[in-house]
Curated annotation (Swiss-Prot):
It comes from Burkholderia cenocepacia (strain HI2424). Keywords: Cytoplasm, Lipid A biosynthesis, Lipid biosynthesis, Lipid metabolism, Lyase. One of its GO terms (biological process) is lipid A biosynthetic process. GO terms for molecular function: (3R)-hydroxyacyl-[acyl-carrier-protein] dehydratase activity. The keyword Protein biosynthesis does not apply. The keyword Amino-acid biosynthesis does not apply. This is 3-hydroxyacyl-[acyl-carrier-protein] dehydratase FabZ. The active site is at H54. It catalyses: a (3R)-hydroxyacyl-[ACP] = a (2E)-enoyl-[ACP] + H2O. GO terms for cellular component: cytoplasm; membrane. The lineage of its organism: Bacteria, Pseudomonadati, Pseudomonadota, Betaproteobacteria, Burkholderiales. Involved in unsaturated fatty acids biosynthesis. Catalyzes the dehydration of short chain beta-hydroxyacyl-ACPs and long chain saturated and unsaturated beta-hydroxyacyl-ACPs.
């Protein structure tokens, strides 16, 4: 990603995503190039509610939430392409996850860097290559497939 770099703060993210606490998992967009990719971050705090039970003696961010954070970054990339007509009534759904791999634990105090690259758009399905890193090391990776629906048209 290079040429035109767009970054978004939490205030702009809140206008684009319907997610709210405790499931909003993107704190800032560091770089976004429409139709190419996005680099975002999630600051992982000990105050996250999931750490109470996963795991109390050795808190680890659940892998499915890392994938969710990557999907939220993908949604921001999608909405940069195609601004929803009614953002408050627009939902972004997973339709598939392929090749998910978890390579390292994510712990309180880590800064999760979310890198998502656009691959293709076919028949209403967006496909992305997604990699989450901590300190330059891959924590998780997957291919994500998502679709956009209005809340009243959702399954």
């Amino acid at each position: 990603m290079s040429t035109e770099k767009i970054n978004l703060d939490i205030h702009k993210i809140l206008t684009l995503l319907p997610h709210r606490y405790p499931i909003l998992l993107v704190d800032r967009v560091l770089e976004l190039e429409p139709h190419k990719g996005i680099k975002a971050l999630k600051n992982v705090s000990i105050n996250e509610p999931f750490f109470q039970g996963h795991f109390p003696k050795r808190p680890v961010m659940p892998g499915v939430l890392i994938l969710e954070a990557l999907a939220q970054a993908a949604a921001l990339l999608t909405f940069a392409e195609e601004q929803p007509k009614d953002p408050e009534n627009t939902l972004y759904y997973f339709v598939g996850i392929d090749g998910a791999r978890f390579k390292r634990v994510v712990e309180p105090g880590d800064q999760l860097i979310l890198n998502v690259t656009f691959e293709r758009y076919i028949r209403g399905i967006w496909k992305f290559k997604a990699v989450a890193e901590v300190d330059g090391k891959v924590a998780a990776e997957a291919e994500l497939m998502c679709t956009v629906k209005t809340a009243d048209a959702a399954p």
